[in-house]
């Protein structure tokens, strides 16, 4: 696509001057260059999806425990815990990222995938924790208590009653955590020290450059990968709902 004197290229068009409603010519140059050996797009995409899924799993697990503590228990320091969970909301992103980077350097996790996953999880935790706290408060504890009365232990009550009941909220928290991690740029750049390559990290320099052919192609891959994972989450949710319906229908 060419939209002015300097011109911007797009993933599937060679020319798209204003005010034309449709492109004048189409071209696959952006996609061809993206999947060429120089870009290593497959490797970067795999790393991005892996980091985002790991972040979603870790964040959702911690958020579930935090949500249960905040919604079901009254203890000393409860409000302090709530404040700590929401703290990333209150600190400017740049200040927060610098602080996390220093902490991870001291822990020896800077420049590692584990450090990036941990940093992303800290950012995503407030969103996921709020989702899970509200879900657990709405669900209450009556079904869990009934399961225990029927002889279910703590682990069995969680696996057979609590988690299935909370599956929509769990998938919502996981989806939120996934998209936050998948789209992180600045935090990944700092914590990853340029060693951990993700889709957002590789795409940003092309967005800032004059020729946006590769950036547009990366954008297409970015959207497609996100939709694919969300479709997977939707399939999992539908399967869980179908199992619950079959169970109650006998």
What positions do the PLM features span?
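Transmembrane-helix boundary motif in ABC transporter permease subunits
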Residues: 51-85, 98-105, 141-143, 158, ...
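A structural signal for multi-pass alpha-helical bundles of membrane permease subunits
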Residues: 3-16, 46-47, 96-108, 116, ...
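N-terminal, non-cleaved signal-anchor transmembrane helix
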Residues: 1-46, 50, 237-250
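Amphipathic cytosolic juxtamembrane alpha-helices at the membrane-cytosol interface
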Residues: 46, 50, 74-82, 125, ...
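C-terminal transmembrane helix and the adjacent membrane-cytosol boundary/short C-terminal tail
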Residues: 133-144, 148, 154-161, 216-250
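Membrane-interfacial helix termini and adjacent extracytoplasmic/periplasmic loops
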Residues: 18-22, 28, 72, 77-79, ...
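Transmembrane alpha-helices
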Residues: 1-4, 122, 129-133, 140, ...
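Interhelical loop and adjacent transmembrane-helix boundary motif
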Residues: 16, 28-40, 181-236
């Amino acid at each position: 696509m060419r939209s002015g004197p300097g011109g911007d290229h797009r993933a599937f068009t060679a020319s798209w001057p204003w005010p034309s409603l449709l492109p004048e010519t189409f071209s696959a140059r952006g996609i061809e260059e993206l999947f060429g050996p120089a870009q290593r797009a497959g490797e970067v995409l795999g790393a991005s999806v892996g980091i985002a899924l790991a972040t979603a799993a870790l964040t959702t697990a911690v958020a579930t425990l935090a949500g249960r503590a905040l919604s079901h228990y009254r203890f000393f320091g409860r409000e302090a815990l709530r404040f700590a969970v929401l703290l990333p909301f209150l600190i400017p992103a740049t200040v927060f990222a610098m602080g996390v980077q220093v902490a991870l350097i001291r822990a020896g996790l800077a420049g590692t995938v584990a450090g990036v996953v941990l940093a992303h999880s800290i950012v995503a935790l407030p969103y996921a924790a709020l989702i899970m706290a509200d879900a657990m408060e709405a669900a209450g504890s009556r079904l869990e208590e009934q399961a225990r009365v029927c002889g279910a232990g703590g682990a069995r009550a969680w696996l057979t009653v609590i988690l299935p009941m909370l599956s929509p909220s769990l998938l919502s928290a996981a989806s939120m955590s996934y998209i936050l991690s998948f789209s992180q740029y600045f935090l990944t750049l700092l914590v990853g020290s340029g060693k951990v390559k993700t889709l957002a990290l590789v795409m940003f320099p092309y967005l800032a450059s004059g020729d946006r052919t590769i950036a547009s192609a990366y954008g297409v891959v970015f959207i497609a990968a996100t939709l694919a994972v969300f479709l997977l989450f939707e399939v999992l949710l539908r399967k869980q709902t179908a199992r619950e319906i079959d169970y109650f229908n006998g």
